[in-house]
Regions:
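Conserved catalytic core of nucleotide-sugar-dependent glycosyltransferases
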Residues: 1-64
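C-terminal catalytic/acceptor-binding lobe
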Residues: 53-55, 59-180
């Protein structure tokens, strides 16, 4: 991901898609530009923007860089395995999302970005809904002097199908030390 991002002068944030949004049985592009990047972010540290707020910090940061005319890259070619929101106890589920926390979370983003964000009721809970269409015109721009290589560099990787239990299933395989 970093090698890909380094080709461009204006990619501010990049990261992998959640595996549950990129099912292997579906056809996806290698990446999607100018949308949100959740949880696992590769960030250009020269940005003037910093984390802020209590909720949706990743979405807020993405929206601020997109509004500056920069780009984000969400990779489908690489995914991250993460438990679906509010399916595990602890962390944000207990601290931020209990009681009216889901509504507060959604409303905070709508208040920060009323031009593109609103509160909606989806999946039996309050959610934020962001319209990323205004950022379609943010075009990826190669760095000065970058020459695209000929051919395909697979970096020594092979695509294989692995039928193993999920990292979050109770039957996940562990080694002798108890590590995955």
């Amino acid at each position: 991901m970093e090698d890909f991002v380094d080709r461009y002068a204006n990619v501010a944030i990049a990261g992998p898609q959640y595996d549950h949004f990129a099912k292997s049985k579906c056809v996806h592009p290698a990446f999607c530009a100018n949308t949100r990047i959740y949880s696992c972010l590769l960030i250009d540290n020269s940005l003037p923007h910093r984390w802020r707020g209590r909720y949706n910090e990743d979405t807020d940061l993405c929206l601020r860089v997109l509004k500056d005319g920069l780009c984000t890259v969400l990779f489908y070619a690489f995914t991250q395995e993460k438990a679906t929101t509010m399916t595990m106890r602890g962390g944000n589920t207990d601290e931020l999302y209990k009681d009216d926390g889901r509504l507060l979370m959604a409303q905070s983003l709508a208040d920060q970005h009323p031009d593109v964000a609103r509160v909606s009721w989806k999946f039996n809970r309050w959610q934020h809904h962001v319209d990323y269409r205004p950022f379609r015109r943010n075009a990826l721009k190669y760095r000065d002097g970058y020459i695209p290589p000929s051919g395909i560099d697979e970096y020594g990787m092979r695509l294989v199908s692995v039928e193993e239990p999920s990292l979050f299933s109770e039957q996940a395989p562990c080694d002798a030390r108890g590590l995955l």
